[in-house]
Each structure stands twice: as structure tokens, then as C-alpha cells.
Amino acid sequence: MPKLQVLVATMGQKDFSKIEEMNIASDVIFANQSDDTKYDEKRFDGYLAKMITTGTRGVGCNRNIALEYADGDILLIADDDVKYIVGYSEAILKAFSEVPQADALIFNIRTVGKFVERRKNKQIKRVHYLNALNYGAVRIAVKRKKLIAKNIKFTTCFGGGTIYSAGEDSMFIWDMLKKGMKIYTYPVVIAEVDQTTSSWFRGYNCKYFYDKGALYCALTNKWIARFLCIQDLLRHQTLFKESGMTFRQIIDQMDKGIQGYKTLLPYKDNGRNIEKNMLGG
């Protein structure tokens, strides 16, 4: 039977208490960012837990460390605030046996709190570019050998602790599609996550829109990115009203992000120029 391995990106861990907190019942790797550099192992309930502690920073870098140490057949991407349901491992392996052509499957996760409303999978369906940006990394299980064959890793420019605050999961999925991997949704809940608060979301502010522009440029090019920015605003105009910014101001900020991405210019060095103008500074 294929082996499932959970890859957890975490910080500041001193022990293996996350095994119980996350209800893990499979092999697991904790990529732990801290001030130390060390390697630990623990056997539990017939499974093996590994903890790789490094002084690196950035969620993409952390996930890549977990990928480097992984030896499972199916890899389940995770954050340390996820709690898995009983039988998640069996459910995931069963799903791959039912959809053998899939290189990766995207599952359902129950969200506790109102910060994020996750799109719910209702059927087994192929993921394409048009719907690829609807899913986060912690819903993804993927065949390790496919990632190796396609040389796919997480970006180190997007996500917590990097230049741009979010988007590493979107780029991971996009990269899989670009390199010909077959991704499907699967309508089974495998976990729940409390997202009453967020480690990176600080509201629909100038930096949010600047980083969105940079993400769309990273995924495509500056011309398609501008189109994606406009359609994003049109689809989410009710949400974006919370920003207090006009349509033109938001587009200008996104365009700054598109321009800044060419030289990996962060918001603090580029986007704030618009913010100052908006505030009359």
C-alpha cells in the first residue's frame, strides 16, 4: 500500500506535541523554523515523525525543506493549525485509488471562524487554469515522484516571511499545471482549520492589492496580469469595498505590484508611494 506522509510547515517547536494537536495518524515531517539547526525523530503508534529545525525564514523555503526530506508516496501539505479527522489517511489513499490518473488531489477542509470561506468540492473534477486559484496548499495531496520528475518546488518570493505576503499555494498549483500534472478535486473532508485570525491578512489595504498585482504578474505576464486584476476586482467588488479605496486607486496599486515584480521590488519600496498620494502626504 502507498505511504502517506504529512508535511507540516511550522515555527518555534520544541517537541512533538503537534502530533496530538493535529490528530496526525501517519508519517509526518515537521519543517520547523527556529533559531537552532537540528534533526529529531520520534516513533508513535507505528508511524515515524521527523523534525527538521533550521534558521531559515519564509513559508516557501520551509515547505521545500520538508519536500527534500520526504520519502512518502503521497505527500499531504499542511500548516500547523490544521486538525485532521479520524481516518484521513485511509480516505486520501482511497481517493487516489479511485482516481488513478490524478497526480494531485484537492480535498475539502472545514473552516472554523469567518476569516475565509473555502470553496467546497462537490464532485470529482479536473482542475484547470480558470479555477486553479481557488485552492490553498493545505488541501493538496500529491504524488512525490511526480514532483521530483517535474522539478516542482514552492516559490520563496510569495507567502509568509517573504517579499509578497501570500500566493505560494497558487503558484505551486499553477506550476503543476504548467508542467502537465493532472489535478482533480475530491469531495471528501479531511481536516478542519481555525482561521478566525490570519498570520498574514491585515485587511484589504494597499499592500494586499500591491501583492496581488505581483502575484498575477508572476503567474502570467504584465498584460494578462492587468486583465486578471480587473476581473478580480469585478468579482469581489463587494468585499473590496471594505478597503475604502476607489476602483481606480486599487487598480493603480495592483499595477504598481505588477511593475515592482519585474525587479522583485517589495511594497515598502514601491507601493507606499501611492499610499502617500492617497493620504495627501
Where do the PLM segments sit?
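Short, flexible, basic/aromatic active-site loop/helix in glycosyltransferases
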Residues: 116-148
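Glycine-rich, basic loop-to-helix element that forms the pyrophosphate-binding segment
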Residues: 54-70
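N-proximal low-complexity "stem/linker" segments adjacent to membrane-targeting elements
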Residues: 1-29, 40
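Short aromatic/hydrophobic "clamp" motif used to bind/position activated sugar donors
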Residues: 75
